[in-house]
A protein has these predicted regions:
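N-terminal beta-alpha supersecondary unit
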Residues: 2-86, 220
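Surface "functional belts" at beta-alpha junctions
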Residues: 3-6, 16-21, 48, 54, ...
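A general structural signal for well-ordered alpha-helical segments in protein cores
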Residues: 56-60, 99, 223-227
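Stable alpha-helical structural segments in soluble proteins, enriched in small hydrophobic residues
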Residues: 66-70, 105, 123, 223-234
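Phosphate-handling active-site elements
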Residues: 70-77, 103-113, 128-131
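DPxDG-like acidic metal-binding loop motif
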Residues: 81-110, 115
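Glycine-rich phosphate-binding/hydrolytic loop that grips phosphoryl groups
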Residues: 218-247
Length: 260
């Protein structure tokens, strides 16, 4: 692995103005993590992590595979992109820590990617006629991480890297009921699969929650989606110093709330 890393190390850790040729993306905020390698002009290579194993175990081997692939293709890893949240506390923490360490070790640049903004982008790509996207990720404890975006505002936010400003925490019931009563065809709701099951989940029973069957699209963020989003931030040079990249948990953990 050290030999593979040596191939990727550049001469300037402090600030590199060279074009990004190869990007490694990390997605660990959901139930199924993944790693993606996206070299200039080549089809992205996605590695799905085994959900039955701990991310800390599977990330290392997947990253080693990507580094080997970049060496074989002769394209160094110039940038690491990572989903910084919101999402699973443990998954986000592992992903961000891995990305920071890797970016520092490879002397490459780092892009911090907002999970809800990626989700909105997936929906906008999937539905070209949709003007407004309201996306949700599972925050557990009958809560959701939510962001609502107008298409033009979402696109303009790349200029100042302000996507995270739209992130909110909602009661799950509020989002479900809004999705159930919205009839405007230009507004689309989408969420990860576990969110659409909330109403019937005995662990998250919400008797006052209206059915959203057939009204909400499901989506799952992959590292390839993270990479696609990151390339747009690369165009605006929104790089983060490796040691300054932090998770966006958006709220306290259950343990932290008990201490308050």
């Amino acid at each position: 692995l050290n030999e593979l890393i040596d191939f990727n190390v550049s001469s300037d850790r402090s600030g590199n103005s060279q074009p990004v040729r190869g990007l490694l993306a990390i997605e660990s905020g959901g139930r199924s993590g993944s790693i993606a390698w996206d070299g200039s002009g080549l089809p992205p290579h996605l590695i799905a992590l085994d959900p039955a194993k701990r991310s800390a175990v599977t990330l290392a081997s997947a990253i080693a595979e990507v580094i080997a692939r970049s060496r074989h293709e002769g394209i160094p890893i110039d940038c690491v992109a990572v989903n910084v949240g919101p999402g699973s506390f443990t998954g986000i923490r592992i992903g961000v820590t891995t990305a920071k360490t890797l970016a520092y070790a490879l002397s490459c640049r780092l892009i911090a990617v907002d999970a809800l903004a990626v989700a909105a982008g997936i929906l906008f790509d999937r539905q070209p006629a949709v003007a407004t996207a309201c996306v949700a990720l599972n925050a557990y404890r009958q809560q959701l991480f939510v962001a609502t975006w107008q298409r033009n505002d979402w696109q303009n936010a790349f200029q100042d890297n302000s996507h995270a400003a739209a992130d909110e925490v909602w009661p799950a019931e509020r989002w479900h009921n809004l999705a159930a009563i919205t009839t405007d065809a230009s507004v689309c709701f989408a969420a990860e699969p576990s969110v659409t099951r909330f109403r019937d989940d005995t662990d998250c029973a919400m008797p006052n929650c209206q059915s959203i069957a057939g009204t909400v699209q499901t989506l799952e963020i992959t590292a390839e989606d993270v990479a696609q989003f990151a390339w747009r931030l690369v165009q605006h040079a929104h790089f983060v110093p490796a040691l300054d990249c932090n998770p966006n948990y958006l709220r306290d953990s259950a343990a932290e709330e008990k201490l308050r």
